[in-house]
A protein has these predicted regions:
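A short, glycine/Asx- and small/polar-enriched loop/turn
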Residues: 5-12, 54-61, 70, 192-196, ...
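Active-site lid/adjacent beta-loop-alpha segment flanking the redox-cofactor pocket in flavoenzymes
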Residues: 110-208
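General small-molecule cofactor/ligand-binding pocket signal
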Residues: 2, 43-45, 181-183
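Helical element adjacent to the flavin cofactor pocket in flavoenzyme catalytic cores
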Residues: 16-74
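A conserved beta-strand/loop capping segment in the N-terminal third of enzymes
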Residues: 1-13, 140-144
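Conserved hydrophobic/aromatic beta-strand scaffold that supports enzyme active sites
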Residues: 62, 103-105, 125, 199, ...
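C-terminal lid/capping helical subdomain adjacent to the catalytic/cofactor pocket in oxidative enzymes
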Residues: 204-230
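Central helical "cap/lid" subdomain
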Residues: 65, 69-115
Length: 230
């Protein structure tokens, strides 16, 4: 343990290590996917909210957006925790609960941690990014269902209690983390299925409608394979 991550707490006596694991900046990765899709003819409408599916006699005929109707006979719902809200006219729904994950980002500091750290019971993970910032994430926590608005977008804000609890877990694993000033805090909502595996299928009673939801926090890692399946 000390050879790989010498500054971890002395409370840690053993760990597993996977040389092929890694991590990447999720924002930069999504932007790279977007640019690659555009090179292949994909058109994005950012900020265009889908209000309703247009279904007639068991067939999809289009979707109603915040800027008008889009006629189509094929649609993939891959909208995470919002998926079931768009399927109220169907007998199908994705079984999911919606917990929140507390995420804390620090100001950049000197590089002291190379591997991604995860705790065995999955209640905390951390990594040091290329910039030097640390990013800590809690495990799945109960969410009260409330959303606020930030930069004209819905925003899930974790409670101070959850922030402090996540920090304490981080300090127990990496004591030097106490010297890193906090830069930002936010909450991430999980579309968590009972077995923590996604549902990718045709919607049985609506011809032309497909669903990919319930990724349970694994979407970033399995996205490349998911694209081939869909």
């Amino acid at each position: 343990v000390r050879e790989i991550a010498p500054l971890l707490s002395k409370k840690i006596h053993s760990a597993s290590f996977c040389r092929t694991d890694g991590h990447a900046d999720p924002v930069a990765t999504v932007e790279a996917y977007k640019l690659a899709a555009e090179r292949n003819g994909c058109i994005f409408h950012i900020g265009r909210e889908i209000k309703k599916l247009c279904i007639n006699e068991g067939k999809l005929e289009g979707v109603v957006s915040s800027e008008g109707k889009i006629n189509t006979n094929s649609c993939l719902l891959a909208c995470g925790v919002q998926t079931n809200l768009l399927m109220t006219d169907s007998n199908f729904s994705v079984p999911m609960s919606i917990p929140i994950v507390t995420v804390i980002q620090t100001e950049p500091v000197d590089k002291i941690l190379k591997p991604v750290i995860g705790v065995g019971n999955a209640n905390m993970s951390m990594r040091q990014e290329k910039s030097g910032s640390f990013r800590l994430s809690s495990g799945a926590q109960d969410w009260n269902g409330s959303l606020t608005e930030k930069d004209k977008k819905p925003y899930a804000c974790p409670s101070l209690e959850k922030v402090y609890a996540t920090l304490d877990l981080g300090f127990n694993v990496l004591p030097l983390l106490k010297e890193s000033p906090i830069k930002d805090v936010w909450g991430g909502l999980l579309d968590l299925t009972p077995d923590a595996l996604p549902v990718m299928d045709k919607v049985p009673d609506i011809n032309g409608l497909y669903v990919a939801s319930g990724f349970s926090g694994h979407g970033f890692g399995i996205a490349p394979a998911t694209s081939h399946i869909l």
